[in-house]
From Swiss-Prot:
The keyword Transmembrane helix applies. It comes from Yersinia enterocolitica. This is Flagellar biosynthesis protein FlhA. Required for formation of the rod structure of the flagellar apparatus. Together with FliI and FliH, may constitute the export apparatus of flagellin. It is found in: Cell inner membrane. The gene is flhA.
Length: 692
């Protein structure tokens, strides 16, 4: 065994599970050996029994599988099982023709049992049963499963672009991480591969059914010729012997084939849920007492027709009525959602206390009553999990944990509306319709969709609320399709990023310092208040967040402040030196890699005017300010057409002035100074803002 492992380049200390890699080659060798080598009857019995056991196992796995991809190996198993049955037919045909004249046990006990016991030793009945099984397998199960697999493969392939865009939208919104996005993309690809493989694998099963019919005819004709001409058997005796053996061989192969085909039909017709096929069938067939009562009434009427087997019909009528009564009793025991707690009247008003003072939450959300299931943990509301993912992703990217989102219902809002509050003030609102999907036009969608026209609440893109049945069509037309909870979560994520500096308070500053102290205690020792005050540090970090600069690199921030704070106390000046120290990461944020960067620049004449205005403290002339704003807007549009980041590169002395000036009118514009760009970067001006 050690030599075999070394020859196959396998580890010598194999565990049991490591032998699984040899299952495929061993099965192929077994199939080839059955086709070439003559096998004794006992080995044939073992292989026929193994084939039956394999088919039953495959059917049960298909029944208990909850997702199609949980049994992604099924097309390959279908191929191997088909080859196994055909090789068994070849081996059994060989032994029937060679030793069939010796009696019914020539091909083994399994073939004899199927030929005698299952059809009563009557070859005419056996032929009829065999043909019926082949027709069921070939014309009904296999043909239907193949058609479903073909249509499923077509729809899965057509819907792949939309699914990929939906995954990218969730990733960009922070609803999922990179690992989860990779897993979902892999699932989409595997699903397309699976249905494509099933479309082809179904042809193997249909071919197997045809081969079974041909093999039966060949066995009967060949057996007659061999028995009469070579073994001098009577024609009637030869026909009976070889036909029974052939029927037994055909049945013992076709019954597993029928089971495997049924498993294929179960796999391609199931809907992916958290329940297996049996649970879906039971819960959906037997969950309505009225259906049971009506079915019992029909059976009862049939049972009273003269000449009918009254006992059987009335027995099932009673069983259905009993089942309906039991289901009705279970449903009546479930508490209704309308039950409300009884409020006791207060005879005397209690004195007000400080606990009656309601403090405003840093971040809150109010929802209408139709959106309550989305935020109700007991009703498996998806929005709660998405909000947790948003906060975690934001903390990983920006460097601090945003406040908890306090969610409450508001009956004064429209039923499908929500609004997002920061310190009690509304900063965003929108609508979401559970059970429907928002089809967002990213700019390249084709055609229109029936539904309620609206706008994406996060980015203002044109969108339509559509029914679930139109989801695949919308994805094919190029729309980004997201569910209601994703719409709300994306809007919340956008607002948290937009108001990151406002949500960062002194408490978050202290918590961040405590976190840094755990990792680098020497760095923060005597830093507060020895070097800077907590207020100054908070203001510096807030200034960075206001311009979308991550504060994850607290080591660099603290070291820079420790170096410059003794000589400078102005938070804005300290922010400028910290930005220079963080220049590499700031540039990397907008220009990944180390190559050329495409930026907007300032005309030299305009730069001189701005420097003079800054030094003189006179401010910008109204006309100059308007021209600067208009040209900045045009340059921003050119950057967008080029696919370049909206970055304006200016002199270090002008950066803070222009950033404050452009922030209100062009919040998407990012202003960087020349000192924040490393020497290893090549700068190319795509647009120039001048005074003309």
């Amino acid at each position: 065994m050690a030599n075999l492992a070394a020859l196959l380049r396998l580890p010598g200390n194999f565990k049991d599970t490591q032998w699984q890699i040899l299952a495929g080659p061993i099965l192929i060798l077994m199939i080839l050996s059955m086709m070439v080598l003559p096998l004794p009857p006992f080995i044939l019995d073992l292989l026929f029994t193994f084939n039956i056991a394999l088919s039953i196992m495959v059917l049960l796995v298909a029944m208990f599988t909850q997702r199609t991809l949980d049994f992604a190996a099924f097309p390959t198993i279908l191929l191997f099982s088909t080859l196994l049955r055909l090789s068994l037919n070849v081996a059994s045909t060989r032994i029937i023709l060679m030793d069939g004249h010796t009696g019914a046990a020539a091909a083994g006990r399994v073939v004899e049992a199927f030929g005698h016991f299952l059809v009563g030793g009557n070859f005419a009945i056996g032929i009829v049963v065999f043909v019926i099984l082949v027709i069921i397998n070939f014309m009904v199960i296999t043909k239907g499963a193949g058609r479903i697999a073909e249509v499923g493969a077509r729809f899965v392939l057509d819907g792949m672009p939309g699914k990929q865009m939906a995954i990218d939208a969730d990733l960009n919104a922070g609803l999922i991480g990179e690992d989860e996005a990779k897993k979902r993309r892999s699932d989409v690809t595997q699903e397309a591969d699976f249905y494509g493989s099933m479309d082809g694998a179904s042809k193997f099963v249909r071919g197997d059914a045809v081969a079974g019919l041909l093999i039966m005819v060949i066995n009967v004709v060949g057996g007659l010729l061999v028995g009469v001409l070579q073994h001098n058997m009577a024609v009637g005796h030869a026909a009976e012997t070889y036909t029974l053996l052939t029927i037994g061989d055909g049945l013992v192969a076709q019954i597993p084939a029928l089971v495997i085909s049924t498993a294929a039909g179960v796999i391609v017709t199931r809907v992916s849920t958290d329940q297996d096929v049996g649970q879906q069938m039971v819960t959906q067939l037997f969950n309505n007492p009225r259906v049971m009562v009506l079915s019992a009434a029909v059976l009862g009427l049939l049972g009273m027709v003269p000449g009918m087997p009254n006992f059987v019909f009335l027995l099932f009528t009673a069983a259905l009525l009993a089942l309906a009564w039991r289901l009705r009793g279970k449903q009546s025991q479930q508490p209704t959602a309308a039950e409300a707690p009884v409020i006791q009247d207060q005879q005397q008003a209690t004195e007000a206390t400080w606990s009656d003072v309601q403090l405003e939450d840093p971040l809150g959300m109010e929802v209408g009553y139709r959106l309550i299931p989305m935020v109700d943990f007991q009703q498996n509301g998806e929005l709660l999990g998405r909000i947790r993912s948003i906060r975690k992703k934001f903390a990983q990217e920006m460097g601090y944990l945003p406040p908890v989102v306090h969610i409450r219902d508001n009956l004064e809002l429209p039923p499908a509306s929500y609004r997002i509050l920061m310190k009690g003030v509304e900063i965003g609102s929108g609508e979401a319709h559970p059970g429907r999907w928002l089809a967002i036009n990213p700019g390249n969608a084709v055609g229109t969709l029936p539904g309620e026209a609206t706008q994406d609440p996060a980015f203002g893109l044109a969108a339509v609320w559509i029914e679930s049945a139109l989801r695949e069509q919308a994805q094919i037309q190029g729309f980004t399709v997201v569910e209601a909870s994703t719409v709300v979560a994306t809007h919340l994520n956008h607002l948290i990023s937009q108001y990151a500096s406002d949500l960062f308070g002194r408490q978050e500053t202290q918590q961040l310092l405590d976190r840094v102290s755990q990792e680098m205690p020497k760095l923060t020792e005597d830093f507060i208040p020895g070097v800077v005050t907590l207020t100054t540090l908070h203001k510096v970090l807030q200034n960075l967040l206001m311009e979308r600069v991550s504060i994850r690199d607290m080591r660099t921030i603290i070291e820079t402040l420790a170096e410059h704070a003794p000589n400078q106390t102005d938070p804005y000046e300290l922010t400028a030196v910290v930005r220079v120290a963080l220049g590499r990461s700031i540039a990397q944020q907008w220009f990944p890699g180390t190559g050329e960067i495409q930026v907007i620049g300032l005309d030299a004449a305009l730069e001189r005017l701005l420097l003079q205005a800054l030094q003189g403290g006179s401010g910008l002339e109204p006309g100059l300010a308007d021209r600067l704003l208009e040209q900045s807007r045009q340059a921003l549009q050119r950057q967008e057409m080029l696919g370049a980041p909206p970055v304006l590169l200016v002199n270090h002395a002008l950066r803070a002035l222009l950033a404050r000036f452009l922030r209100r009118s062009l919040p998407q514009m990012v202003v960087l100074s020349n000192l924040e760009i490393g020497d290893n970067r090549q700068i190319r001006m795509t647009s120039t803002i001048g005074v003309a």
